[in-house]
Amino acid sequence: MSKASYVKFEVPQDLADKVLEAVRKAKESGKIKKGTNETTKAVERGQAKLVIIAEDVQPEEIVAHLPLLCDEKKIPYVYVSSKKALGEACGLQVATASAAILEPGEAKDLVDEIIKRVNEIKGKTSS
């Protein structure tokens, strides 16, 4: 199965696992937004520290604007393979296409590490 058109770079599984862990920690000790509408608002307002986008969203148009918007606002974003796993990490009973960490809380070090790794990955793919 090929990647969705909005997936701009490959995220290694170990990094994706750290992303979900960061979302869980931030949910408990910081502040997150769940769902594409809330995530989009957080990005537009410049509140998001990290945006997480699921790779298995259908139709793709639901989240296709997020990478472009994040780049425009200089907000880092990362992908996870499953909207179901992202929903669970957010504490939801349902899947979510995207989420944003506004205040990382106890996940601050993890979020910083994720952003550093994402920048390294994006640096390799953009050249």
From Swiss-Prot:
Coiled-coil intervals: none
Pfam family of the protein (one): Ribosomal_L7Ae
GO cellular component: cytoplasm; ribonucleoprotein complex; ribosome
InterPro entries xref list: eL8/uL1-like (IPR050257), Ribosomal_eL30-like_sf (IPR029064), Ribosomal_eL8-like_CS (IPR004037), Ribosomal_eL8/eL30/eS12/Gad45 (IPR004038), Ribosomal_eL8/Nhp2 (IPR018492), Ribosomal_eL8_arc (IPR022481)
Induction entry: Constitutuively expressed (at protein level).
Keyword Ribosomal protein: yes
Superkingdom of origin: Archaea
Compartments where found: Cytoplasm
GO molecular function, one term: structural constituent of ribosome
Keywords: Cytoplasm, Ribonucleoprotein, Ribosomal protein, RNA-binding, rRNA-binding, tRNA processing
GO biological process, one term: ribosome biogenesis
Presence of keyword Cytoplasm: yes
Described purpose of this protein according to its UniProt entry: Multifunctional RNA-binding protein that recognizes the K-turn motif in ribosomal RNA, the RNA component of RNase P, box H/ACA, box C/D and box C'/D' sRNAs.
HAMAP family per record: Ribosomal_eL8 (MF_00326)
Subunit-structure text: Part of the 50S ribosomal subunit. Component of box C/D small ribonucleoprotein (sRNP) particles that contain rpl7ae, FlpA and nop5, plus a guide RNA. These sRNP particles form homodimers, giving rise to an asymmetric holoenzyme. Probably part of the RNase P complex.
Family: Belongs to the eukaryotic ribosomal protein eL8 family.
Entry protein name: Large ribosomal subunit protein eL8
Taxonomic source organism: Saccharolobus solfataricus (strain ATCC 35092 / DSM 1617 / JCM 11322 / P2) (Sulfolobus solfataricus)
Lineage: Archaea, Thermoproteota, Thermoprotei, Sulfolobales, Sulfolobaceae
